[in-house]
Amino acid sequence: MQLMDTAKPHENTTKKIEYWWQTPVLNRRAWTWEDARNVKHQGEWWQNAVIYQISPQSFKDSDGNGVGDLNGIIEQLDYIASLGVDAIWLCPIYESPMEDFGYDITDMRDIDPLFGSLEDFKRLLAVAHSMGLKVMLDQVWSHTSDKHPWFLESRQNKNNPKADWYIWADPKPDGSPPNNWLSAFMGHSAWQWGPERKQFYMYNFLESQPDLNWHNPDVVDAILERAKFWLELGIDGFRIDAPNFFMHDAQLRDNPVRPEDAPLPDGVAPDNPVVRQLFKYNFCRRETLDALKPIRELMNQYPGTVGLGEVTFCEDSIALASEFVAGDERLHMAYHSGLLVDEPISAKLMRQMMEKVLSNFTQGGDCWIVGNHDYGRLRSRWTGKDAQGNPYPEKFYHMIATLLLSLPGAICLYQGDELGLTEARIPEDIPVEDIKDPFGQALYPAIKGRDGSRTPIPWQGDAPHAGFTTAEEPWLPVPESHYQRAVNLQNKDPNSLLNTWRRLLHWRKKQPALEAGNLELLDTEEPIFAFIRQYAEQRILCIFNLSNESARYDLSGYPGCEETKGLGFTTNRQGNTIEIPGYSVFFCNMPLSCDYQLKSN
């Protein structure tokens, strides 16, 4: 669970702060991406999977109440399968007061009636599996709802069986909170008074989301018992929400003030008051690595399942995420906020990103993500202008899809990004009084919240509410601009962004070098970003023009290079020089007999 209105650029030239995760805890041998892919080719599906993220409230409403549900997802599973993805990840569907879209849970083992029933979920699981789709569930283990039976018992007094299941602390002598920690959501004190116990309880997000005490082994056992319930049903894995928030400093020491010249944490809106502090004691703790061990031990009992951790909202998320997957006693995969940035996207940024990922994820486990339910829409974050001041053309987003699907590792694709949906605007598309996100409600207008990336999927361009619901009003409105990007309209257009994603996803499955190969970065100059992917008998040269102006690349060092056709991009080759139009791509297959010479272009 994160809370981004906008994210900072990846590169930061201000004062460097050192954190424990920037010095690897484990000794790591020299390693290549091919090592990790060998695991996949021995039967692990997740190493290079494309995972389609579904926000159930906004996907498809089947019963006319204005909110998406499980049966609505079942109705559209054939659409998801047609994309060529490998798995679906469902955001929380458990019993909840819905104060934070289901990330405030009261029962981790049952379905909220808003979405359907446990029988509906079992049917979804069966239908998805029949279509070759894996199913992953969101798991929220850092906190619960304040209406959860555990917390209702814990708050009564200091002596009950659940008294130490949450983080309680006495006030200071003057009655103020135990320390200076701030809520990541609200930006004020992370402590709320509990009059029954005459103590404060800690929360990192909303006051109604008290943090569980992961220092208590009984809490861990209870969480794993609930995880086992879903594994026994036959699900294929978990997306684990905010695992870097699991552990806190048991001494409750104050966080230091962030120096004015210190960089901001990755993916955190600069207007969020929480950035006034360094995240040293309240989360991102070293002891979290030990907390991952029992999770992995449980999942090892269910071969073929995967644990995918969300590691954002921290300083240097790439380095920290890599620690969460190092060795065989932690998570299988983790995603970071490396590409959850605002523009500009450039060859320099991409090279820096890849160099950092390759040097940190030395044992695999990287998962790429460019958008989700907590961040602004990809198309609205990367809305830059070319040299003439014109907005990025449509072809830019086709190029970005190709780039993402060419990188090593797994990929998360957020619903609607394949359609090129833009961020819903506040107040133009969503009136201020209709903001649903508590983060936006608390901090608007400095931060508009996350509603803009959670509006309903447009299924039909000529239907009320774009075919999402038959209700008079959906839970969030469908922006007017989204109707023209509806699924039924893009299905008919072979050159649509939707069909580009489909074409690329199905093509990628047939390319061992892209699915399983190592990656060699090439030394290029703006605006060219290029690399070579190789696995077994296949070697592919991948060249991207990250500008709207034509660019040339010298192919004389790559004899026998044959251009890959059918990807939807045009280039002009004259001898050993390839001219790549703006925001276009050149792929070529290189014979293994080619003794290529890396040269600066």
Predicted regions, residues:
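Loop/helix patches that line or flank the sugar-binding groove of alpha-linked glycan CAZymes
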Residues: 16-21, 25-31, 45-47, 251, ...
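Acidic/aromatic-lined carbohydrate-recognition and catalytic surfaces
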Residues: 2-228, 232, 245-315, 457
